[in-house]
Amino acid sequence: MLQRIYLDNNATTRIDPKVKEIMDPFLRDHYGNPSSLHQFGTETHPAIAEALDKLYKGINARDIDDVIITSCATESNNWVLKGVYFDECLKKGKNHIVTTVAEHPAVRSTCNFLESLGVEVTYLPINEHGSITAEQVKEAITEKTALVSVMWANNETGLIFPIEEIGAICKEKGVLFHTDAVQAIGKIPVDVLKANADFLSFSAHKFHGPKGIGGLYIRSGVGLTPLFHGGEHMNGRRSGTLNVPYIVGMGEAMKLAVEHLDYEKEVVGKLRDKLEEALLKIPDVMVVGDRIHRVPNTTLVSVRGIEGEAMLWDLNRSNIAASTGSACASEDLEANPVMVAIGASKELAHTAIRLSLSRFNTEAEIDKTIEVFSQAAVRLRNISSSY
């Protein structure tokens, strides 16, 4: 069987063997419902507490704060936006939300839905580097602003947004602040206190944990109407039987993610840079966005004259996995939204390819990818009518 190379880690990651190992006993032996009073239920409590402790430490949350288990970051994002709608928009008359055009569909689409209910949403434009400034946020806030929601790192470009500056402005203005940290955790340090975050979303499968489990940090003293009703789980904030093996796995994945931050910067970042520099030697290839303020694993490149989907399928034939954009929207075959947002033509935006690495990638895999990508660029341009 030919070697398979996975460079789509911003879509999902392989589960770390240590995570699988720690989950196994709770899939096999300790399967009781944690809410049950008998020993099958109560024997799971120490493992849940330990996992939550790892999550708290991973984002520097305080004991008085809440880290609520959810099914994924999409749920967490929906919960924040819709909860704020109930708590701030309907009850207090604060009918304005500030976000950006670069957000994940889980935020953008939810904001679109809230607009249909009468909420005013300001979508801040990104500049030619793919970023926004804290000053843009400050200027957008009004007396009616209920929430500012800005991602910590962009899923397409890997660009890091000025979260600490934005959080400080929101605190000064008395406006709730939410950040989607899905693409930041495990790649750069994430500290909810330094960020002045009221809410922070994350998803285990983006940092080598299991799929179908995520979390929402809620700062102490901040109310949020539940999205689900039907039980008193998670201090009454989210109903549903706790998924013990996945909670345990997510906790361990968070612990490992923090332990590997230096490796991400020093090793994964250098592999990304090696890949990027080699691809830039191909004529008419460019890197999209700021190349300095990025997470270390991500590059978004445009190969002029080649449809991103064509390059994607060519790479796939050689057992290399990449992406043309967000996995939650990639089947739509739309132009890359970040490239459109920075002002690229739709023709150019269709040429984007995202390559995202992990700590499990090797230098040999990067060398092979460079070889295959370079050959594919020549072959596809030879048959292209637009180059």
From Swiss-Prot:
One of its GO terms (biological process) is cysteine metabolic process. Its EC number is 2.8.1.7. Its cofactor is pyridoxal 5'-phosphate. Keywords: 2Fe-2S, Cytoplasm, Iron, Iron-sulfur, Metal-binding, Pyridoxal phosphate, Transferase. GO terms for molecular function: 2 iron, 2 sulfur cluster binding; cysteine desulfurase activity; metal ion binding; pyridoxal phosphate binding. It is an enzyme of class 2 (transferase). Pyridoxal 5'-phosphate binds at residues 73-74, 155, 183, 203-205, 241. The modification N6-(pyridoxal phosphate)lysine is found at residue 206. Pathway: Cofactor biosynthesis; iron-sulfur cluster biosynthesis. HAMAP family: Cys_desulf_IscS (MF_00331). Homodimer. Forms a heterotetramer with IscU, interacts with other sulfur acceptors. PANTHER family: CYSTEINE DESULFURASE (PTHR11601:SF34), CYSTEINE DESULFURYLASE FAMILY MEMBER (PTHR11601). Master enzyme that delivers sulfur to a number of partners involved in Fe-S cluster assembly, tRNA modification or cofactor biosynthesis. Catalyzes the removal of elemental sulfur atoms from cysteine to produce alanine. Functions as a sulfur delivery protein for Fe-S cluster synthesis onto IscU, an Fe-S scaffold assembly protein, as well as other S acceptor proteins. This is Cysteine desulfurase IscS.
